[in-house]
């Protein structure tokens, strides 16, 4: 790398031209594919925020989900809750019901053209399956043995009494309670099924435009549902990145300006990071990969890593530069000391992110692969273009640059100031009170391990938005008033080889068992607002056939069950039956409305069903299959967490091998892993103690911990060995470490730690999490490096520095490992 940097410094025009040409070329290819979709050999920018794609297309849960949706004729829903707290009857007044009818009619005609797998398709609101007052049946007796089916709201009522009658009809039908009409009888929920989730945000926008035309009646319209949240996140994701990332870069720029006071020099730091980001994201698009939630965060991960190495070079150059020395000579010295730690920190960081390719989640695999590529791109740009740039800046630009020129007196090589003084004090404390530092670290680790045991793995796409966001507000309102906006489905069918009769789900004992399961879930599982199934239709129709409230039960014979279903086929939407069973009655479906989309709540429901079936076996041996978006989210989260744990352990092992090779010593290799271990354990201990859910961004940030913590440790230990090879004394080495090496590390901590706090201004919670945890990781990794490492080295200096210790017969310091000797000045 030394020769590469020197070659770039001497042939700077060629390197600048080459890097810029490649980056612009990729960017133009990415743009051309997007501007001219369908052009041969070009790939357009494709955005995908569907959490389903966190699993591969052939994942069993996805295969079951797609298959069973077709079996039962199910679609995803856009849910609209209508609440009017200013009217004594809520929304059950003529004007609100007229508006609801108008909104329903507008939704029926919504059609959109979408692109799926490169093909244009039509997607629409499934008008025939809308659940709304004017679209569902009122079921009532018209004499013993006869049932009358009419629309619940055949026309918009003109009087208040007519509006009340609509409510009373809805409340008399158990299937509508908590689903269509709220428990207090004052709010309505509308369910608009869509043929593809990709249109959910477009449907939401069209509905909001229609609602905006309504006369103000005091009613509030809340739109939510998992498809809406997922699609809305994609719509806002790039806007937030377009605001948050530049704010972060501005903050980094201002902090670099504070430290180095030279605009022209620090502009390169920003430019190098942007080159790495543009190169990586353009390559991702050109390669045909979609931009998922994960890959949208690639720039946030590359920027700090790209700036890390540049700050090390700039800090070392800053401390060495004087106008009377040849610049190329200074660059040789700087790169001579830094090339090994910079190369190996880049390799270890690359290994950390590349290990994510071992996870079972395709978007995480793509994220890991391209961050790894971005890290290597940032390394190449930094070690070539930074030396080249330092050679071309004018003397006027460097007139006030260089620490030595600002110092006075005997300490000319030791810059003065609060930062330098504080670091020297820290070094002195770590050296003199090493055992105290180690004891304190042990206590922190113990508490952190305890905190890790409190971590709950949990995620919910709705909570990717701030609590004040209209999606979150709608979610709270709808789930407070109704059974729930989160859908999960449970398919039942006899096990292969089971002694099951023909048409098992016409058997009264089987239907009663399902009704018992429904009742158990609604009464004993707080996350289940409502469980709907075939028994609801059968019991309701049976009651109206006999004209008696006591007849709200499952009939006693399969023939009577068949009669109720045949009667229901005279309704306006007889196909509703097939949402709950198949035409040969060999499968059944339970539709669960959950009031929470948290993975841990879905897991509780699954466990409750398992326990019920174990304690109350069905009349015949049954097999069950869960499906629905809420369940899919549970599965991909489980796979991600397990995959992340395996990837972290694997990358930990790879990094350990790399640093052992770097230092040619297992002892130094293990020592370099200490800040990483402390940082990861402490970060996740804090996550556990504060009650933060272990979600997607929290899991992925463990890889960033690995890269940053090892970066600091390698630089600190490599420079320690270089200095010790010259001083032959740990007591003399320690103060020197807390000069330029410690200042470079601290500048990185401050610049990047503070620089990414602007992400907290984002309205999207994953970006807030990334901003908070990146800052915390940087601070903890820096403290672990600057406090714990010197304390540990101070306990075993003779053992650790055996290779660097001079024998009497030697006349010069040996290479002494990978790091020692790398810094001998030329």
Question: PLM features: residue spans?
Answer:
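Signature of alpha-helical transmembrane segments and their immediate interfacial
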Residues: 1-46, 387-388, 396, 404-460, ...
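Extracytoplasmic
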Residues: 70, 151-263, 274, 515, ...
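Alpha-helical transmembrane helix bundles of large polytopic membrane transport and channel proteins
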Residues: 95-181, 194-195, 200-203, 212, ...
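Interfacial segments of transmembrane alpha-helices in multi-pass membrane proteins
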Residues: 238-289, 358-362, 646-691, 761-765
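Pore- and gate-forming transmembrane helices of large, multi-pass membrane proteins
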Residues: 241, 270, 322-359, 673, ...
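Hydrophobic transmembrane alpha-helices and their membrane-interface caps
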Residues: 265-313, 666-718, 757, 787, ...
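Transmembrane alpha-helices and their membrane-interface boundaries in multi-pass membrane transporters
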Residues: 286, 303-315, 339-358, 363-410, ...
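Juxtamembrane segments of multi-pass membrane proteins
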Residues: 421-558
